[in-house]
Amino acid sequence: MDLFNYSRRETSEVNIGASPMGGSNPIRIQSMTNTATQDTEACAAQAKQIVDAGGEYVRLTAQGIKEAENLMNINAALRQDGYMVPLVADIHFNPKVADVAAQYVEKVRINPGNYVDAARTFKHLEYTDEEYAQELQKIRDRFVPFLNICKENYTAIRIGVNHGSLSDRIMSRYGDTPEGMVESCMEFLRICVEENFTDVVISIKASNTVVMVKTVRLLAAVMEKEGMHFPLHLGVTEAGDGEDGRIKSALGIGALLSDGLGDTIRVSLSEAPEAEIPVARKLVDYIMQHQNHPYIPGVEAEDFNYLSPSRRETAAVRNIGGEHLPVVIAERMDGKFETNPQFTPDYIYAGRALPEVREQGVEYILDADVWQGEVGTYPAFNYEQLPLMGSCQADLKFLFMPYMAQTEEVIACLKHHPEVVIVSQSNHPNRLGEHRALVHQLMKEGLKNPVVFFQHYMENEAEDLQIKSAADMGALIFDGLCDGIFLFNQGSLSHAVVDATAFGILQAGRVRTSKTEFISCPGCGRTLFDLQSTIARVKAATSHLKGLKIGIMGCIVNGPGEMADADYGYVGAGRGKVSLYKKKECIEKNIPEEEAVEKLIELIKANGDYTENNL
């Protein structure tokens, strides 16, 4: 694994209809319908919309035998109209449904957490090694006949592990850990290898981006150790909608794509399925610009653990580094110094002139040659100003520096100036590689100066900035290297959008919270209420509750499991019915949909977590 130079992980090719995946094939884009699978016309129409938007695979839920059998009609309707897109059946709880679906679609997704094991109940189960082996034999006895059906019908499979639906068996032995998620997958993969079944795709997903990235990294390493090269499907489950959904997806998926992991992606947005496709396409196209880049001669620090990174040890300089949360630096060189109270930067880079009226609680950065030592202001130097920096008496100094400027002179200077915060810059096609290389060099030299990452863009659309900046920052955050973020955009976007994006990235990476976090699924044929309007109502009532995590889930597949990561949850329980959760405990069942949002607010209030919105 080269941390500094991009190359795609070598994978085996998997045949999925006329659109193979893995090997030398491009990274495929996909989405999932949210129409009822027994409604042939609606499913075919939505599948066409996904394909017309650029989708290369279409997934449909099949919760029962009738739905699985109707996949034949949906497939036929699409083929009749000239749409040859491979269809994927999404199966939970009932392996018999997978057997049926495998006869009518090009790929079947099964969930190891509920394929043979009973649905998750959060009970701790004790197994002897012999009893555990017997459970694995049960999986083999049920799984092998399914593989034989797939062989007969040239059907591929996806072994799709979800953090929210691990079995009690796995949870009891491994805990709620990346190791448990990986083993849940490997149990099935080893059977595939033993049965010489190779048309297999793997996915391990979570709404928690830290868990998702760490687990996929570990899965790739474990597969490599066991000589497996199956392609990877990437996604952040329950990413949400709007700005949050895009940032969260780009952060998690982008971090893995940037390291060459991933052969197909789905951006799971709580929006129309076809809206996911352009976002996914932009993300893949942006990462693909890393290909064939000039070589970066970085050297990995000896004490860095890619599979289980911890935050880099730094010495705090005022409120930057050490145990402090990552800071946000914003620029205001155009003289427009207004800020959003919810997303007020910690520092504003003003360039060569301070504003006439300063924002309360904000500190300012000025170019060193015009800095005059005013209270609440700090000087910024470039790497060619080392003598000036050395003689400056400020207790906080910013040094803007690209990786290739890290000379012996610079290193020697930094060893005598712990008050310097480094602002890492890069114009390299693979800026992640250079940012990483700079920090790893600091680590090798034993330097503990905090590092803020400067990311430069020229975007006119908020979505483009959100996708690119989140993708660029993802691995840096998950590697534990980030003491701050400085987004500098020279397009037409407002400062408010840029600031909100920076704070959104830190929240999506779970290193700094600035607002309510919503964990919401994209919906599928199992969802029996209007998910998008429900999300809007829940957000309107709770978006001011900074720090709370609220889950809004369409059904019970991942709903209860994902509630373990949420403070409160709203989970579909049947047509027009909702259950409410506090963490993973179901508090009230089968509430009429029209009353559920009000009941959710009552639950939050009853537990002392609600404050009135005074804005």
Predicted ranges, named:
Residues 282-335, 362-389, 395-399, 504-531, ...:
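Extended, intrinsically disordered, low-complexity segments
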Residues 2, 55-187, 318, 327-339, ...:
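Active-site beta->alpha loop and helix N-cap motifs at the rims of alpha/beta catalytic domains
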Residues 1-31, 147-153, 289-336, 540:
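N-terminal amphipathic alpha-helix/helix-capping segment at the start of soluble metabolic enzymes
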